[in-house]
Amino acid sequence: MINQSIWRSNFRILWLSQFIAIAGLTVLVPLLPIYMASLQNLSVVEIQLWSGIAIAAPAVTTMIASPIWGKLGDKISRKWMVLRALLGLAVCLFLMALCTTPLQFVLVRLLQGLFGGVVDASSAFASAEAPAEDRGKVLGRLQSSVSAGSLVGPLIGGVTASILGFSALLMSIAVITFIVCIFGALKLIETTHMPKSQTPNINKGIRRSFQCLLCTQQTCRFIIVGVLANFAMYGMLTALSPLASSVNHTAIDDRSVIGFLQSAFWTASILSAPLWGRFNDKSYVKSVYIFATIACGCSAILQGLATNIEFLMAARILQGLTYSALIQSVMFVVVNACHQQLKGTFVGTTNSMLVVGQIIGSLSGAAITSYTTPATTFIVMGVVFAVSSLFLICSTITNQINDHTLMKLWELKQKSAK
């Protein structure tokens, strides 16, 4: 029986951890081209290239490290994986504040991907600790913390960076992240992790988890559409700043306009994420994803066609309302399909595959923006969003909460080993 008071306390800490982590990581994202230009005298093409590399860099090392951290969480403690990720992020933010060249910044971003991963660790912890009937709602609310952090980060980033400078801003966030880590060490309580002597004899190999995820139709197809969602989303990141500048015919500063656009997107995401989670709990996950990704694609195309800030703002709001359903739905399918003692391994393995889209999308988006126009980038990525829905539309997957195929595969493996 789950102790509700402990669970509520744990959830608040996880929500706060994700909020601080994402806010700290997103303070620079909308202003990344400006930040790169401040580090070194670069051409427009070089700025876009370095910005794309900087966005993609953490994903490269995350792809390698995420399954390993997930497996360690299942084996040792999911709580300490959350704390490890917070501490790693705090150290990397501190090092970012000391960077003086784009290359140094990219190298630290690689370290961030290797030692960070707060969202993955929190998702694994939450999915193992939460009541089974509320997992969708819990993942939806955790997604709202990501959205809230992504909203607050750019807002405080633009204002604080103008007053204190980028280095002081990063130093401050590093200190706050470290404080949250200490608080989590004192207050976070793990109740579902079994001592090693009581743990069932389950094969927890990373290679085995990849096989199970990719050989099961439901998880495989959801991971594919998740990869495409990340590809499209991250492909638009470096294009937003120049797109906003090109359609800004007002007296408002471009940096402020970008902040308003990001605020609109993430506010919409905060409001909609828990709602999508509740729909998933009611077993509508396939329908939710198909509807949301098509609407998200249409919103991206509309942004590419925008000729003024008002139209661009409306399209950003629509994208925020729908994008919040996507990755949480992928994780919902995965955590409901795997064994209780394998949540971390499967979440880590899934994230390792999802970041492939982040890497390729960041670089592709930067390349398209450099050699065509920002509007073209948004239209291309919108088409990717919409077309990805075909992987679910053309499947035989039904709207169900649990798919126990993965559990059965692990049980068969266990029996054959005896």
Curated annotation (Swiss-Prot):
Mode of membrane association: Multi-pass membrane protein
Record-linked InterPro entries: MFS, MFS_dom, MFS_MdtG_subfamily, MFS_sugar_transport-like, MFS_trans_sf, Tet-R_TetA/multi-R_MdtG-like
Pfam families: MFS_1, Sugar_tr
Major localization listed first in the record, in broad terms: membrane
Cellular compartment(s): Cell membrane
Knockout or disruption consequences: Deletion of the gene impacts growth in iron-depleted media. Mutant is partially impaired for staphyloferrin B secretion.
Keyword annotations: Cell membrane, Membrane, Transmembrane, Transmembrane helix, Transport
GO cellular component assignments: plasma membrane
Transmembrane regions: 19-39, 49-69, 88-108, 163-183, 222-242, 257-277, 287-307, 317-337, 353-373, 377-397
SUPFAM superfamilies reported for this sequence: MFS general substrate transporter
Gene Ontology molecular-function annotations: transmembrane transporter activity
Induction pattern: Up-regulated under iron-deficient growth conditions. Repressed by Fur under iron-rich growth conditions.
Function, in words: Involved in staphyloferrin B secretion.
UniProt similarity note: Belongs to the major facilitator superfamily.
Protein name as it appears in the record: Staphyloferrin B transporter
Annotated source species: Staphylococcus aureus (strain NCTC 8325 / PS 47)
